[in-house]
Amino acid sequence: MLDDCEASGFINDKRYAELLVRSNIARGHGPIRIRQAIAQKGLTKDCIEAALIATDYDWFELAKAKAKAKAIKKYGVPKVTEVKGSQSRELIAKEKAKRVRFLLSQGFSYEQVIYALDYDPLEDNDD
């Protein structure tokens, strides 16, 4: 029965993997987390890699958008353009470490995280 469905095209691992990739991208997940989530569904590594390549998504910009959204959620609409004098370097370092851990937990590589945090999301007033 399942073989008939697969032969007819009703069951297609490639389409399913692409759907899962798009769904995870919409949630703001990075490629590492997406690979893990899809692998848990039982799809092969080749199928997962093909789906990730087919999306041709800019993971660096997704990481940057995720960092900005998190900063806005935490601090509100970005209006502050400089660090207050009362904040020490230690507090700034702790906050940056939190941001790094958050983005890593969302499935972004360290290189993507560094790109995303290379700017101050509280200074970016483009939106």
Swiss-Prot record:
The Gene Ontology biological process annotation of the record reads: regulation of DNA repair
Predominant location of this chain? cytoplasm
* GO cellular component annotations of the record: cytoplasm
Q: Where is the protein localized?
A: Cytoplasm
Keyword annotations for this protein, in alphabetical order, are: Cytoplasm
Describe the function of this protein: Modulates RecA activity.
Per the record, the similarity remark reads:
Belongs to the RecX family.
Q: Which PANTHER family match?
A: REGULATORY PROTEIN RECX FAMILY PROTEIN
| Name of the featured protein | Regulatory protein RecX
The record lists the lineage as:
Bacteria, Pseudomonadati, Pseudomonadota, Gammaproteobacteria, Alteromonadales
